[in-house]
Swiss-Prot record:
Lineage: Eukaryota, Fungi, Dikarya, Ascomycota, Pezizomycotina
GO molecular function, one term: endonuclease activity
Residue stretches of biased makeup (Basic and acidic residues): 278-296
Gene: LCL3
Name of this protein: Probable endonuclease LCL3
Topological category with respect to the lipid bilayer: Single-pass membrane protein
Record bears the keyword Thylakoid: no
Domain TNase-like: 77-262
Transmembrane segments: 38-56
SUPFAM superfamilies (alphabetical): Staphylococcal nuclease
Length: 296
């Protein structure tokens, strides 16, 4: 004689065992994979992963050196970062900080911009004052290559040359460099990149925000009379701003500001020239011709 209810328990156990075994035999792998309970989570996970990777590669992946700047970035992408050093008055070093403060740069412990030279080595984008983060370093292409930094050159403008390789310093070169340092050093800038030049620098149009206003660094330099239009036979980049740049240079000449200022009486007595100032392009051409004569 069985106890009351014992038969039901055994029946349930048997049903559970048969259901599990039967399900293994009844459901093929094809049926399992096409089951909505399997498909929906799989698709959701795949789409989320692909989207996250896409967002990271597009907006959050840091560009440590010029060699990581892909060709499809040119004329299509802006680089946001902090200027670590300024070289000559038309180039600087940039530490790329994708996403800015929203992505944690400047306040998360693992997203702090290095302040020491060894921390910046191999991690900044070099730009001859065209965009990006500034880093006070020599404009020597060899140093740029050795440090593997993002070196940025300002697009469309040419600033007076500092003393390099035994050549004399141009008038207003130091003033132009100090002006640029005051404007962008240790500040965040956005550089719209145009191309990579022969010295492995990124030519870019750079913007810096001062209060609520965004300023075009190259344009402001022309307005201050501390740079000229870049007049090389090839390689000049202006984006859509060439007319604006040329108008700013002409206005600075007319107002006689910066390098276009006429010498004062005391400067004339001291031997200052009253001729039109030698442009950076003329300076480079003169020294190139002199170097060529020395070799012959």
């Amino acid at each position: 004689m069985r106890w009351f209810g014992s038969g039901d328990d055994e029946k349930k156990k048997k049903q559970v065992g048969e259901t599990w075994a039967d399900s293994l035999r009844a459901d093929s792998w094809g049926q399992s994979l096409t089951n909505p309970r399997t498909l929906i989570p799989t698709f959701a996970f795949t789409i989320t992963t692909v989207t996250a990777l896409r967002l990271y590669k597009t907006f959050l992946r840091r560009i440590p050196t010029v060699n990581h700047v892909k060709p499809h970035y040119f004329r299509r992408k802006g680089i946001f970062g902090k200027v670590t050093t300024v070289g000559d008055a038309d180039n600087f070093r940039l530490y790329h900080t994708p996403g800015g403060r929203i992505a944690g740069w400047g306040w998360l412990p693992w997203k702090m911009v290095p302040t020491k030279r060894e921390g910046l080595s191999n991690q900044t984008v070099g730009l001859p004052c065209h965009l990006g983060l500034l880093s006070i370093v020599s404009d020597s292409p060899s140093l740029v290559a050795n440090n593997f930094q993002l070196h940025i050159r300002l697009a469309g403008v040419d600033a007076p040359e500092l003393a390099h390789w035994g050549r004399e310093e141009q008038p207003y070169a130091k003033e132009a460099q100090e002006w640029l340092i005051n404007l962008i050093h240790n500040r965040r800038v956005r550089a719209y990149i145009y191309r990579r030049d022969q010295y492995d620098r990124i030519v870019a149009q750079v913007y810096v925000r001062r209060w609520l206003f965004r300023k075009d660094v190259g344009l402001e330099m022309l307005k201050a009379g501390l740079a000229t239009i870049y007049e090389a036979k090839s390689g000049a980049e202006f984006g859509t701003s060439e007319a604006k740049y040329r108008a700013a240079e002409e206005k600075a000449k007319a107002q006689k500001v910066g390098m276009w200022a006429k010498p004062t009486l005391l400067q004339k007595l001291g031997g200052a020239s009253t001729k039109a100032p030698e442009s950076p392009r003329e300076y480079k051409a003169r020294h190139a011709a002199a170097d060529k004569l020395k070799k012959t």
